[in-house]
Design a protein with these regions (language model features):
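Secretory targeting and sorting signals
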Residues: 1-27
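Lectin-like carbohydrate-binding module/patch detector with strong preference for beta-trefoil
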Residues: 28-173
């Protein structure tokens, strides 16, 4: 009987090793999200109405604790990032076909219209410009210095002015 038990235990141990039964628990890494606020208005970059839809507009609005104002920076090679909305998992997208406005769309790593770079423009205040890879001399701009909620930023020629400078406040979750 002892020999049968020993054989069964050996077989069970071998099966566990093959199946990876002896694994080490790993915690999921925390993702750092950022809330981007325009310097001139203090308003946050927001996916309008918390929409999950492909093509939903990115707008500026009063900063809240909503996940539609939190964005992860996903590495896209050569110092560029995809800016992914926490609430929808979709990425900020711009381009000529969108009249250089910003929307969320399904993330596709091979789309240059979804790759951005963050340019630090003021080390003291931590202000950045968000520039699309296809238009390196252009950056995310709130039009006409507007401070109104619901205004959709577009891509404008970088002039290092306050509607083009954004604070990036980290939030880990």
């Amino acid at each position: 009987m002892a020999r049968i038990a020993r054989t069964a235990l050996t077989a069970a141990a071998g099966l566990a090793a093959l199946l990876g039964g002896a694994t080490t628990a790993h915690a999921e890494p925390n993702t750092t999200y950022f809330r981007f606020a325009a310097e001139h208005s203090g308003k946050c970059l927001t996916v309008a109405d918390g929409s999950l839809a492909n093509g939903a507009a990115a707008v500026q609005s009063t900063c809240t604790t909503g996940d539609n104002q939190l964005f992860a920076l996903k590495p896209a090679g050569q110092g560029y990032f995809m800016i992914q909305a926490k609430h929808s998992g979709r990425c900020l997208t711009t381009g000529a076909d969108l009249n250089w406005k910003v929307q969320q769309k399904w993330c596709t790593s091979d789309l240059s219209t979804q790759r951005w770079r963050m340019v630090l423009v003021d080390m003291t205040t931590g202000l950045h410009q968000l520039c699309p890879v296809d238009q390196p001399a252009y950056c995310l701009t709130v039009p006409d210095y507007s401070t109104a909620d619901g205004v959709q930023p577009g891509i404008g020629q970088c002039q290092n002015v306050s509607p083009q400078r954004w604070t990036a406040t980290a939030s880990v979750s």
